[in-house]
UniProtKB/Swiss-Prot annotation:
Family named by the database record: Belongs to the short-chain dehydrogenases/reductases (SDR) family.
Active site, renumbered: 157
Role, per record: Catalyzes the NADPH-dependent reduction of beta-ketoacyl-ACP substrates to beta-hydroxyacyl-ACP products, the first reductive step in the elongation cycle of fatty acid biosynthesis.
Summary of subunit composition and partner proteins: Homotetramer.
Binding site for substrate: 144
PROSITE patterns assigned to the protein according to its UniProt record, in alphabetical order: ADH_SHORT
MF-aspect GO terms: 3-oxoacyl-[acyl-carrier-protein] reductase (NADPH) activity; NAD binding; NADP binding; oxidoreductase activity, acting on the CH-OH group of donors, NAD or NADP as acceptor
Pathway(s) annotated for this protein in UniProt: Lipid metabolism; fatty acid biosynthesis
Entry EC no(s): 1.1.1.100
InterPro entries in alphabetical order: 3oxo_ACP_reduc (IPR011284), NAD(P)-bd_dom_sf (IPR036291), Sc_DH/Rdtase_CS (IPR020904), SDR (IPR050259), SDR_fam (IPR002347)
GO biological process, one term: fatty acid elongation
Protein name according to UniProt: 3-oxoacyl-[acyl-carrier-protein] reductase FabG
Enzyme class: oxidoreductase
Length: 248
């Protein structure tokens, strides 16, 4: 069954590269208008133009820095001048500040929580108006395998990714009466520019932990997000789908 999202408007945070861009492209390929966000407005607009040309859909680029509530509010002013509302929200944007716990500063802790959790909270609140009014919406939060397993040097990041699961399950219960579905996707090791800088020795070490014996691709994550945003997933809410090659 072909998934069609014509007439829908999708906001994907942190979508100028990596998994976020793959998700935005996948939604655009199904006919959705997409809103690209990133800390560089110029880069976001360039990516939006590339996607619009490639898929023949409307695409808009907007600067949004989740460290700043002011930036988020300004971004939504711009967004609501471009579209009448959001039908699909993918909370993908996130940062890391990796350090061993005893060396982690309060700033390392606070910035990761501010972007990955508080930023998600603010973006979601700003996106709900149309979904609730029309009694249809999709929210997909991008968590991580480390939200379930933990990881050395990532106490801050792992905490936020675990927190997104509680956020997802609680919000799903609140919004279900309005037919707004809220789910999460938890990727494992995915080939991105973050993994590209790792040595072959380190990559091999990680691959040995994965039953499928390889890293995933951003598109494999995007495929799951597309499914959750479609009518094929109309009876799924409050769930987490793991895309990790069988790690657990």
């Amino acid at each position: 069954m072909e998934i069609k999202l014509q007439g829908k408007v999708s906001l994907v945070t942190g979508s100028t590269r990596g998994i976020g861009r793959a998700i935005a492209e996948k939604l655009a390929s199904a006919g959705s208008t997409v809103i690209i966000t990133g800390t560089s407005g110029e880069r976001a607009k360039a990516v939006a133009e590339e996607i619009a040309n490639k898929y023949g859909v409307k695409a808009h680029g907007v600067e949004m820095n989740l460290l700043s509530e002011e930036s988020i509010n300004k971004a939504f002013e711009e967004i609501y001048n471009l579209v009448d509302g959001i039908d699909i929200l993918v909370n993908n944007a996130g940062i890391t500040r990796d350090k061993l716990f005893l060396r982690m500063s309060l700033l390392d802790w606070e910035e990761v929580l501010k972007v990955n959790l508080t930023g998600t909270f603010l973006v979601t609140q700003n996106s709900l108006r149309k979904m609730i009014k029309q009694r249809w919406g999709r929210i997909v939060n991008i968590s991580s395998v480390v939200g379930f397993t933990g990881n050395v040097g990532q106490v801050n990041y792992s905490t936020t990714k675990a927190g997104l699961i509680g956020f997802t399950k609680s919000l799903a219960k609140e919004l279900a009466p309005r037919n707004v579905l809220v789910n999460a996707v938890a990727p494992g090791f995915i080939e991105t520019d973050m993994t590209a800088v790792l040595s072959e020795e380190i990559k091999q070490k990680y691959k040995e932990q994965i039953p499928l014996g390889r890293f995933g691709s951003p598109e494999e994550v995007a495929n799951v997000v597309l499914f959750l945003c479609s009518e094929l997933a109309s009876y799924i809410t409050g769930e987490v789908i793991h895309v990790n090659g069988g790690m657990f």
